Curated annotation (Swiss-Prot):
Signal peptide: none annotated. Arg-211 acts as a selectivity gate, preventing misactivation of ubiquitin by this NEDD8-specific E1 complex. This is NEDD8-activating enzyme E1 catalytic subunit. Pathway: Protein modification; protein neddylation. Heterodimer of UBA3 and NAE1. Interacts with NEDD8, UBE2F and UBE2M. Binds ESR1 and ESR2 with bound steroid ligand. Interacts with TBATA. Binding of TP53BP2 to the regulatory subunit NAE1 decreases activity. The keyword Glycoprotein does not apply. Belongs to the ubiquitin-activating E1 family. UBA3 subfamily. It comes from Pongo abelii (Sumatran orangutan). It is an enzyme of class 6 (ligase). The modification N-acetylalanine is found at A2. Residues 53-70, 157-161, 192-217, 331-338 are annotated as: Interaction with UBE2M N-terminus.
Length: 463
């Protein structure tokens, strides 16, 4: 897409490509539905109105596409995911897959309405699918009790639209990278049939957002990574010697006392879903809090700090899920112009919404298809490069593995996910880039948990 393309022409082109991708075949089979079941949907698809797409032609084919053909993947079956699944099933979408790696906890029941007390301990995806398949006639929800990383590109390519209700930025970035990897280019021109639209929703307390991402055409997750706040971490000196907040006491026990005392046996890791582990952290945190006259340590707060739980409000989930489901409907039917492309919701004080067009970043590490330029002195140590990859607001990598081609061989400079390799490559962190044999213009390949793709960086030496 040309950089100088006018916004209106750009919007029209996107709409045409979406309509082409969602084009449906004529003909419809017997759905077994009772008369009047889909009247509420037909009002949007079988007649025109002031808000319909200028090129939309009312017909029965769009509804049949939803009922018989359109395949939607919902990632996440938590507070937002339950709302999404319900909205999609009642809007005519019947071919729905859902992925969630979590099991149901008693704390979920107040807002995740597809679950009941008898379901505690069972996989969220499986219970949600069972509930909807039983409650909504002819609905076929297929559950996957897995991580999103467990599936390959063939799996994701089968869906017409993917919608996310995640509480993890890492997972968002990974699925963003996966959908970008599905894109096909012919002579530098994007093949629109390879685009799998991504609808992403997120909530925190009384705030939320929803966005429409057309990989390769509009701003992706990485283009706007700076919008996501970094995870709150407390300085170790404060935690150890000057605690002031109940969170400081909990973090002290989690980070220092647990590995030192190993209360459940040598090498047993802390499990945030194990009540006995949380109870131990809670009691030790109370003891430390009493030493510093700190109040406010509760079992719920302990669980929230250990599991990094994001505050959830049912009404916020309902609003954001409604927006996301509406965008799925608009894209699937091409009946209405989709959101362009980012919506913010806030009802902390009154009600506020705002929509704006997030712009693509020219040098986005995910969707620009360009190597990322980084500048360092030849005397800089590899540790400085590692710090840059993890601390940069536009990269925010978690455990980058750095490799380079030296003397015709692919060499791992540092990899921390495998203990034996980490121990072998750790000395490289204290070496300079020149000592490692890197030269000006050297390409570094970096792998990270935030993306299924390897990110290429071009190293430029500064004088």
């Amino acid at each position: 897409m040309a950089d100088g393309e006018e916004p209106e022409k750009k919007r029209r082109r996107i709409e045409e490509l979406l309509a082409e991708k969602m084009a449906v075949d004529g003909g419809c089979g017997d759905t077994g539905d009772w008369e009047g079941r889909w009247n509420h949907v037909k009002k949007f698809l079988e007649r025109s109105g002031p808000f319909t797409h200028p090129d939309f032609e009312p017909s029965t084919e769009s509804l049949q596409f939803l009922l018989d053909t359109c395949k939607v993947l919902v990632i996440g079956a938590g507070g937002l995911g339950c709302e999404l699944l319900k909205n999609l099933a009642l809007s005519g979408f019947r071919q729905i897959h859902v992925i969630d790696m979590d099991t149901i906890d008693v704390s979920n029941l107040n807002r995740q309405f597809l679950f009941r007390p008898k379901d505690i301990g069972r996989p969220k995806a499986e219970v949600a699918a069972e509930f909807l398949n039983d409650r909504v006639p002819n609905c076929n929800v297929v559950p996957h009790f897995n991580k999103i990383q467990d599936f390959n590109d063939t799996f994701y390519r089968q869906f017409h639209i993917i919608v996310c209700g995640l509480d993890s930025i890492i997972a968002r970035r990974w699925i963003n990278g996966m959908l970008i990897s599905l894109l096909n280019y012919e002579d530098g021109v994007l093949d629109p049939s390879s685009i799998v639209p991504l609808i992403d929703g997120g909530t925190e307390g009384f705030k939320g957002n929803a966005r429409v991402i057309l990989p390769g055409m509009t701003a992706c997750i990485e283009c706007t990574l700076e919008l996501y706040p970094p995870q709150v971490n407390f300085p170790m000196c404060t935690i150890a010697s000057m605690p002031r907040l109940p969170e400081h006491c909990i973090e002290y026990v989690r980070m220092l006392q647990w590995p030192k005392e190993q209360p459940f046996g040598e090498g047993v890791p802390l499990d945030g879903d194990d009540p006995e582990h949380i109870q131990w952290i809670f009691q030790k945190s109370l003891e430390r809090a009493s030493q510093y006259n700190i109040r406010g340590v509760t079992y719920r707060l302990t669980q929230g700090v250990v599991k990094r739980i994001i505050p959830a409000v049912a009404s916020t989930n309902a609003v954001v899920a409604a927006v996301c489901a509406t965008e799925v409907f608009k894209i699937a039917t091409s009946a209405y112009i989709p959101l362009n492309n980012y919506l913010v919701f806030n009802d902390v004080d009154g009600l506020y919404t705002y929509t704006f067009e997030a712009e693509r970043k020219e040098n986005c590490p995910a969707c620009s298809q360009l190597p990322q330029n980084i500048q360092f002195s030849p005397s800089a140590k590899l540790q400085e490069v590692l710090d840059f990859l993890t601390n940069s607001a536009s990269l925010q990598m978690k455990s980058p593995a750095i490799t380079a081609t030296l003397e015709g061989k692919n060499r791992t400079l540092y990899l921390q996910s495998v203990t034996s390799i980490e121990e072998r490559t750790r000395p490289n962190l204290s070496k300079t880039l020149k000592e490692l044999g890197l030269v000006d213009g050297q390409e570094l390949a970096v792998a990270d948990v935030t993306t299924p793709q390897t990110v290429l960086f071009k190293l430029h030496f500064t004088s």
